[in-house]
Amino acid sequence: MRVVLFGKNGQLGFEFEKLLKSRCELLALGRADEGGDLNDLKGLVTRLHSFSPDVVINAAAYTAVDLAQTHEQEARQINALAPSEMAAYCSQTGALLVHFSTDYVFSGNGSDPWTEEELCNPQNVYGQTKFEGEQLIKQAGCKHLIFRTSWVYGEHGKNFMKTILRLAQTKESLNVVDDQVGAPTSAPFLAKHAHEMIRILQSGREDLCGIYHLVPDGEVSWCGFARWIVQNAKNFGAELRLEPTSIRSISTEKYPTPAIRPLNSRLSNAKIKSVLGTESFQSWDQEASDVLYKLVF
């Protein structure tokens, strides 16, 4: 199997490269590599045709949620137009496109987990561009797997877990929102289960193409996640100035940001668990423990 991976230097791409480099003929591309800059659509398409992959994995994205509010064209280029070109290639050649999307395609209303079939209504530019990317991929008519996920973190790259660990070294108190609820999702978890789905489709189950919500089991608020990070880092032996009890909960209303954040980021993972033949995934905190341990040590 020949695979092109875009976004090799991001937290998800990093995990995919580790997972796949000994399992297939892999071309992993970062922004500085020929064909790896998603702002250069012509170069991207040329690289795809020269390598002729069976699978295209797009682990690249414009994820600066607040910055996207004032850089809409740049966000759209990366999150919608580049995936559209990948989808066009896959439609022409029969390759499989694997793409990652977000809980931000939903409005954030209510408290029930969002299913794959529910109406999308993104509330910020980032969510709008990610939703447009989904639509363009589907319109291309290619074989595709689109994985919506939430609150991604990992050993590599910038993320909430690493930010909290850094702040906890010097801060004596911290305010974190407690009315946004979702499932923190580790990059290794995403790479592992996405790879399982790729193998299933490549075995002939093209009827399983489509959108899947890929998150671990359970839910937590950002404030609860922050407290969990600090407490468990201390349990692992990290010397931190910040105590979990000194992390104060505040409402989203009292922490205004340029981009609206959804309060309900819960995603139902029932569909993908059914396809994979499992009744449960690991809980978000079990997944987080594995990554946190590596970051602390």
Protein language model features and the residues they cover:
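NAD(P)-cofactor binding segment of oxidoreductase domains
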Residues: T70-V98
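Catalytic helix-loop patch of NAD(P)-dependent Rossmann-fold dehydrogenases
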Residues: Q77, A82-E85, V105-F147, W151-V152
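SDR active-site strand-loop-helix element
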Residues: F6, L29, A59-A60, L97-T102, ...
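NAD(P)H-binding glycine-rich loop region in Rossmannoid oxidoreductase-like domains
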Residues: L38-I78
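N-terminal Rossmann NAD(P)H-binding glycine-rich loop of SDR-like oxidoreductase domains
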Residues: V3-K21
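NAD(P)-dependent short-chain dehydrogenase/reductase
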Residues: Q135-A183, A187-E196
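Amphipathic terminal alpha-helices
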Residues: Q282-F297
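Mid/C-terminal beta-alpha module of Rossmann-like enzyme folds, strongest
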Residues: H193, I200-P256
